[in-house]
């Protein structure tokens, strides 16, 4: 804050009729500030010679000294402010040509690095996608391999079960064939026994015929043999039919059991295959969900790291801005304090000026209306307007 001081000239008044001559120390000053006025200040008693009594002169001298000291302080502060402004301008002019090119080069380097980072991120993302696709393809092929391997094991187990059934059927067939052979052998044995019995009967009947030829009528042996043969053949046919019927029923039951067991086996195998396919599909889906979860976790980790770095940068920027704001607040407070000090100085100076003005007005009121008739050292007097006023109020 600059102050201007307009000191009045020490010459005589131009109009002696309107205002008498006043001493130079009694003229008012347009200055800001305040000062503690001594308690012995009283109304000035003016004389024609323009002199004061002792206490009034001391008060005016004290006020003039204080005013001069304040003016000197103001001029010193103005000189210091001018020097500081000049120093700041020189420092800013010296730093501007050095900082601008370096900042531009740094900005270009930062942009290039950011472009490289973006390209690297895009390439990294592409590679991650390719790796994920390769992992999914490998998992798909692995699941297909496992499915085919499980189907192969299932088919092998089916083949082994069918082989066991075939072995059982072969054993059953061999058993039935052995039974048929035993029945055939039994039939052959029965035929042999029948033939032996027929032969024995023929031999016995032949002897009897030879003995009783003359005593009894002849018996038709061929008819008897035919009847016996027909009876045995009927018995053999009945036994054969029963055995064939039993064999057919047993074979039919076995076939029914084989068909029902094969149908059940096929239904169970189809159900097992369907369940295995469902399990494989669920395993593939589970693996895909695991891969998706892993990729999402990786993306979340990268996003957290990226945003944490950005957050740290923003926090550092906020810290810098807060420190700058704190410095600015300190500067503002300091300037406000200086401003308050200067306002206090101005108020004190204005108080002193008002004191000056009140003293001058009170002394002006006490002076007579006629011009003073004092004579200076050279003999000149202070007359009315138009007269010589060279020695007035020196």
From Swiss-Prot:
Region (Coil 2): 220-363
Keywords: Coiled coil, Intermediate filament, Keratin
Gene3D superfamilies: 1.20.5.170, Single helix bin, Vasodilator-stimulated phosphoprotein
GO BP: any one term: epidermis development
Residue ranges of the region described as Coil 1B: 103-203
Renumbered residue ranges of the record's region Coil 1A: 57-91
Extra remark: There are two types of hair/microfibrillar keratin, I (acidic) and II (neutral to basic).
Family: Belongs to the intermediate filament family.
Name used for this protein in its record: Keratin, type I cuticular Ha4
Species: Homo sapiens
Taxonomic lineage: Eukaryota, Metazoa, Chordata, Craniata, Vertebrata
């Amino acid at each position: 804050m600059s102050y201007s001081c307009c000191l009045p000239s020490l010459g005589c008044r131009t109009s002696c009729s309107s205002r008498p001559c006043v001493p130079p120390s009694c003229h008012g000053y347009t200055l800001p500030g305040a000062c503690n006025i001594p308690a012995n200040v009283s109304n000035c008693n003016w004389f024609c010679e323009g002199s004061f009594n002792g206490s009034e002169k001391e008060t005016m001298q004290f006020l003039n000294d204080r005013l001069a000291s304040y003016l000197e302080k103001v001029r010193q502060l103005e000189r210091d402010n001018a020097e500081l402004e000049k120093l700041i301008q020189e420092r800013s002019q010296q730093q501007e040509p050095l900082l601008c090119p370096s900042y531009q080069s740094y900005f270009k380097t930062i942009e290039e690095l950011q472009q490289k980072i973006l390209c690297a991120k895009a390439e990294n993302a592409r590679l991650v996608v390719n790796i994920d696709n390769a992992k999914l393809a490998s998992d798909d092929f692995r699941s297909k391999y496992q499915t085919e391997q499980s189907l192969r094991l299932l088919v092998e187990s089916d083949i082994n079960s069918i082989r066991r059934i075939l072995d059982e059927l072969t054993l059953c067939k061999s058993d039935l064939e052995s039974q048929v052979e035993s029945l055939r052998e039994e039939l052959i044995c029965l035929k042999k026994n029948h033939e032996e019995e027929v032969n024995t009967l023929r031999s016995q009947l032949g002897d009897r015929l030879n003995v009783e030829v003359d005593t009894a009528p002849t018996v038709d042996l061929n008819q008897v043999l035919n009847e016996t043969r027909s009876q045995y053949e009927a018995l053999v046919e009945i036994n054969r039919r029963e055995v064939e019927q039993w064999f057919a029923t047993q074979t039919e039951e076995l076939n029914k059991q084989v068909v029902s067991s094969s149908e059940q086996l096929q239904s169970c195998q189809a159900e097992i295959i369907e369940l295995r396919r469902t399990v494989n599909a669920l395993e593939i889906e589970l693996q895909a969900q695991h891969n998706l979860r892993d990729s999402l976790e990786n993306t979340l980790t990268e996003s957290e790291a990226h945003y944490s770095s950005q957050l740290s940068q923003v926090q550092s920027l906020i810290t810098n801005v807060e420190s700058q704001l704190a410095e600015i607040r300190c500067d503002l407070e300091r300037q406000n304090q200086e401003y308050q000090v200067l306002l206090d100085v101005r108020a004190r100076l204005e108080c002193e000026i008002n004191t000056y003005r009140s003293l001058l007005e009170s002394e002006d009121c006490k002076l007579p209306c006629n011009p003073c008739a004092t004579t200076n050292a050279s003999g000149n007097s202070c007359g009315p307007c138009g007269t010589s006023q060279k020695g007035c109020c020196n």
